[in-house]
Amino acid sequence: MRKPGIVALAASLALLTAPFASAQTSTIATAGYWKAFGGRSNDGTPVCGMSASGKGLFFSIKLFKGDDEMTVQLGSDRWQIKTGAKQKIVMRFDRESPWKATATGFRFSDGDAGLEFSVGVKNLDTFLVEFARSYSLKIEFEGSDVDGWTADLTGTAAVTGAFANCVDKRL
């Protein structure tokens, strides 16, 4: 049985660690491994997001005011990715069709390596509904010797709802 559907904006992932880039955000909901947050980015732009961390891994979804894309960030304290390097990623929510992207390497404020890519507004609702309804997310790194992840999505329906409320109020 699937989790109840979430309309509009919502999402997040699990089993992942790195600090938020912004000291101006606060947690607005927690469920399972997941947290929804809202506030302002380092440059003062309003932002809403969801994240999970643990075992040296990090996953977040962020939507900034004025953007027509949602930002997805992955991180690991074990990665040796160069800033600007490209990495193909395949993500699959349960048995849904895969999401494919080419991510770009960057550094979190603590120095850990990360990968970042965007999901366009035209695909945002589908992405968030799959995220909120699914039980797990499998992430694979094509053409790399980096092991893939399986993220526990327990709690994503609840934090996706909080994320959607944040977007409605702040963005």
Label for each model-derived stretch:
Residues 18-19:
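N-terminal signal peptide c-region/cleavage motif recognized by signal peptidases
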Residues 96-171:
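Internal interaction segment
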Residues 58-68, 85-91, 120, 125-136:
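Extended Gly/Ser/Thr-rich low-complexity repeat segments
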Residues 72-104:
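Mid-length scaffold segments of soluble, non-membrane domains
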Residues 9-12, 22:
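Hydrophobic alpha-helical targeting segments used for export or membrane insertion
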Residues 1-9:
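Bacterial N-terminal signal peptides that target proteins for export
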Residues 24-85:
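An ectodomain-focused feature that recognizes extracytoplasmic/extracellular
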